[in-house]
Amino acid sequence: MRPFRCLSGVTAAIIAALGCAALAAAASNLKLDFAKDTVGAEPTALVSVVGIWRIESEKGKNVLAVDGRQWKEGQSSVGIADKARALYGERYAEFLDRVQAYAYYPYVVAKDVPDFNNGEMTVRFEGISGRIDQGAGILFNLKPNGDYLTIRANCLENNLVLWKFEKGKRSSVKWVRDTPTPSRQWHDLKVRIAGAKVEGWLDGKLYLEHTLPEPVSGRVGLWSKADSHVYFDDFTVTPAD
């Protein structure tokens, strides 16, 4: 397993600033189909932290693409310095100074969901290409220090995994094999949260169940890995009643 070192300074800057921008403690409903976004641009409702994320057209419909075809270790998102400056003003430099230029796992963060702790998140995805990976995940429990969890599917491996990213290192929490996920087909991924209980669903089937040591609480987003070129659509975040 390869080591992971997060973009500690800028990532922490972005996450903390997002938290300051949203004072409400409860999670917000979110439904994104990217129809009003501009093809070729980054998504307006998601903050691109690591990797190349942009809107592409697929059969005349806007989708969100993570494009790892020119992936390199240490590839932060385009304009990361400007994003940090916009979020932190004159303080941005101190965060950029802490950046460790090594990022293996692309992800975006939902701007308008300050804290999610109960409910479900869904997204549709299609693996397009990738020789190393074709990973598509829902990121959750994202903390200001950059720690987070993700449940991800992989079109090359046909498995569903709950990963933990903590103190700059990745470790598997729960691993489920034999989850058919063909490339070039759309799939439905769902993560359901109830306190510390986590469920992972793929194409309408419950595959993964796990109880964490502590209840989930943090920001959410979408996740991928390495050279994956994957389409995402219809990302929803629905808090429990």
Where are the predicted features?
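Short, solvent-exposed beta-strand-to-loop segments that form ligand-recognition rims
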Residues: 201-221
